[in-house]
């Protein structure tokens, strides 16, 4: 949206801004004063209290944590309130899983206490291991092992003559998002699904099991949501609108994101007892995990399982704590910062490590406010509820306030679980340079160098030792001292509605890689003891997170200059287009090889006659995709971005307040130009044509998703259509940059 102001108004604006920043006087002093307000001890105290009891959605402690957070914000000088939504959140009434043949064994149940972790024995009020938004049911059937339960796994099973129709499948966690596993099982005709944590992923295959080490113990279970998040997140009954008390709701049977089959999670201690009994063909090498057994595929009737799940499907309250510091000169431009406060059980790492870091920022900002400092833009802090079930709290708030957010929000900054290690950032690439500038100013608490310097060193050493897989751009940047690229955003946390539905630029920030939180992820063992023993002793990286995010908030809220550098975004999109072209070329090459193998009957001839594997199914040949318009659009984007960045570098410092305000107005909502109201194929809620969660990756991002996924899934008409639509949004984006450059140059 274009904004303009009269000269007098601009002069008053500038005077007000100068007065507001008088205490402290400059950016470095402001950030130093902010840092002085960050206390790791505060974070430890808050976490210990917030993680002292189960805090899942609807629990008494979840409400108590929200009320305590509200009181803190108000004491620190924020204008704060709780906004409550009534969300569908199923909780378990019955969870039964048992082997009934070749012998009867009752499996599952609550995780046992471990020595040294006091809260692990506090199971009163804790929900048993389960997954949300599965389908209620009571089924008995043969068991089939489907590896990760992803499309290629079902192709491998089909080539071995194994059909899961009418069966219960068991899949291991990993590679793809958990919700895809039962969804694909359901689509292939299975009547039930078990998902287990294999020790190769996060158990003794990666380290000592808890409590000796931080890895997942024998009977640790990963809870989670299995709702079809890649269709839309949020309350399944209120897509596109806030789940207020009086909202119009779908019937549960009509909600497309709720599964129809029963699903339960399982520990590897229990899963091993099932898998050890399976007969049928020996599993191919990619199917083999870390259990001390020979993995078989089953399906021969040797193992039968009884699976029963029944849930309480009533609405539960979700308490979002929303706090504001009103901007002095641009109060209708918002910086939104969020982290959720609900967990699956105690949730010390996920989410409270990020939540207490956010509270530290809020306390430090409140102290600055009381000293007379004022941000130019309004700062909004949100402690979300109900993220774990399917991003309910943030999505319902974003949908409920959609018009206001699209009119006011400049940037959304998200955090979630946090731990020891390297800075990890994903998000809108026009903010990549800002992230790198901030990373150079924050000190790593264990090495004494900047977090940017440590990350560069880790990338270089990882490439040398072949222990990491940095992409070429990251390695080149690390070696030359340039900006480290940030990643793309898929889904899995509270940025999704902001970025992918509303088109608000977003960043997701955390530290990690040297913690051991994966081993207790979504289990009863994600506790204060585990967090402070194995993930971030002393919460030193919690303090580093506060200082990192706080600097970004302060710099964007100051509005003394636009913080975007658009050449980074343009270069990134150009890279994505190269990847899409290579994908199409590689697919055509692969298709040609497959056709020759089929023509020559090579699959049958090469197959072991005693262990026959059928030929790969024939598939349509990948045609040439019409990408000329997208090529031209990327060229226009690169030219416009380069020209804008150059104009700002040459003349930005000389802008008067009126033109600066006009420029802010032109850039505030520029990311919304990357939306297409028609959405992505088959999932219209997702409207962003540059970043989306993958249909078969979930948390993982797909870039240029309308084109890329259409090629991957052989929807070639869609690929051509979305190449054109993506080209249009990039041309519109480039035109806005040209207009912004005109403002800088006085045209």
What are these model-predicted stretches?
Residues 2-21:
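Gram-negative bacterial Sec-dependent N-terminal signal peptides
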Residues 24-29, 36, 48-163, 199, ...:
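Noncatalytic luminal/extracellular "stalk/propeptide" segments of secretory-pathway proteins
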Residues 30-37, 51-60, 130, 134, ...:
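Second-shell loop/turn segments in exported
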Residues 104, 135, 216-282, 330, ...:
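Metal-dependent peptidase/peptidase-like ectodomains
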Residues 121-156, 232-349, 363, 367-371:
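Soluble metallo-hydrolase cores and metallopeptidase-like ectodomains found primarily
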Residues 147-213, 328, 332, 344, ...:
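A conserved hydrophobic secondary-structure block that centers on an alpha-helix together
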Residues 321, 337-391, 396, 549-552:
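Alpha-helical metal-binding/catalytic segments enriched in His/Glu/Asp
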Residues 656-747:
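C-terminal amphipathic alpha-helical interaction region
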